[in-house]
Amino acid sequence: MEEEVENKTEKEDKEEHYLIVDDEVELNTHQRINKELCGSVVELSEGYAKVEFPTTKEMAVDNMGLIHGGFTFGAADFAAMAAVNEPNVVLVSSECRFLSPVKVGETVVFEAKERYHESRKRRIHVIGKFKDIKVFEGDFLAVVLDRHIFKLKLIKDEEE
């Protein structure tokens, strides 16, 4: 399996992560995210994303099947970033509420809607539901950068 991954061409790798949900909107961010850990975008439009997040036994913290909140948060974060849908979007902060426990085997659906869009700043509201039960609600603040965050000079050199 590992050998197969290494032998993929860059084009094949890109195609695997490339997603067009309708004729006009394509996913431009988080294209290499692990869908098994963070879910998959199933709907995408300007300022909106829907992510389906099927939970697995590897995410459980105990024998009862309780899913660790970090996995739930990761899927919500992915939905928020997909709603912004800019290549260099980064999360700045979040205020989240875990409203009901998530159990192994449940598929949580996250809907993310951009609520505020001014210049580089974006506020995104995310709701996660299992069936009709709201399990997560959060507000995310993101910033869209000119280039990848690792290519920015964030601090002055000590020599200056």
Q: What are the residue ranges of the model-derived segments?
A:
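Hydrophobic beta-strand-centered segment that forms part of the acyl-chain substrate-binding groove
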Residues: 78-114
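A conserved, well-ordered hydrophobic junction motif at loop->secondary-structure transitions
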Residues: 50, 58-74
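A generic structural signal for short beta-strands and their flanking turns/coil linkers
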Residues: 35-37, 47-49, 90-94, 106-108, ...
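Non-catalytic surface loops within mature trypsin-like serine protease
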Residues: 55-57, 100, 144-146
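HotDog/MaoC-like acyl-thioester-processing domains
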Residues: 2-20, 88, 103-104, 115-160
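Non-catalytic linker/capping segments at the edges of enzyme domains
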Residues: 1-58, 154-160
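A short, polar/proline- and glycine-enriched secondary-structure boundary/capping micro-motif
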Residues: 61-65, 92, 147-148
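A structural signal for short, well-ordered beta-strand segments
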Residues: 51, 94-98, 112, 126, ...
